[in-house]
């Protein structure tokens, strides 16, 4: 994930830790396999064994390729949390960036498999990129976010604008 964000001139995060754990902290959604604890700059990822108990995630087998993708997603959240512009990014913008990074860093064959499981052409406009779309179907949100981003004339510059705030608004305009 750091290599993915390098062209955006984002530096490694001092003090960022990745912890492998048999469980996630209390309050994490029951279907979550990882989380980022912002104040502590700590990524907590299920160890591979409990991760694999999920059998599948987004329709893909819970294998080592997907495990790496999940870690890339959480590292993207950490980068976003530490480099986002003000005001704080909306939840939808944070997930958009994290899923674009996750899918973009997957091996090509794995990425094609994920996208085939969740067909579409990408969001038509930024108004469609919102918390409702995410809550209704996170896997589709992920695939449509990636497709939307790569359709941009300069996807990296577009991600930089999203990261700087103002492109993807949350519900209620923030």
Predicted regions mapped to residue ranges:
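Stable alpha-helical elements in mature extracytoplasmic
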Residues: 1, 63, 67, 71, ...
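Auxiliary, metal-adjacent structural segments of Zn-dependent hydrolase domains
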Residues: 1-48, 61
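Surface-exposed patches in mature extracellular/periplasmic domains of secreted proteins
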Residues: 6-20, 82-91, 110-119
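Solvent-exposed loop/turn segments at secondary-structure junctions
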Residues: 24-25, 49-53, 78, 85-87
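Short pre-active-site segment immediately N-terminal to the catalytic Zn-binding motif
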Residues: 50-71, 89
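Post-HEXXH active-site segment of zinc metalloproteases
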Residues: 65, 81-103
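Active-site recognition of the HExxH zinc-binding catalytic motif
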Residues: 69-82
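Long, well-structured alpha-helical subdomains associated
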Residues: 108-174
């Amino acid at each position: 994930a750091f290599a993915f964000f390098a062209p955006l001139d984002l530096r490694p995060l001092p003090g960022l830790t990745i912890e492998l754990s048999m469980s996630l902290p209390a309050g994490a959604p029951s279907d979550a396999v990882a989380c980022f604890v912002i104040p502590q700059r700590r990524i907590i990822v299920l160890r591979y064994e409990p991760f694999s108990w999920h059998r599948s995630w987004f329709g893909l087998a819970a294998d080592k390729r997907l495990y790496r993708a999940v870690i890339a997603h959480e590292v993207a959240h950490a980068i976003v949390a530490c480099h986002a512009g003000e005001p704080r990014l909306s939840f939808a913008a944070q997930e958009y960036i994290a899923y674009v990074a996750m899918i973009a860093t997957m091996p090509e064959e794995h990425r094609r498999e994920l996208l085939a499981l969740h067909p579409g052409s990408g969001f038509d406009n930024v108004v469609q990129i919102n918390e409702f779309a995410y809550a209704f179907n996170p896997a589709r949100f992920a695939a449509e976010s990636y497709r939307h981003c790569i359709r941009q004339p300069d996807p990296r510059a577009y991600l930089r604008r999203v990261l700087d705030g103002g492109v993807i608004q949350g519900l209620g305009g923030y």
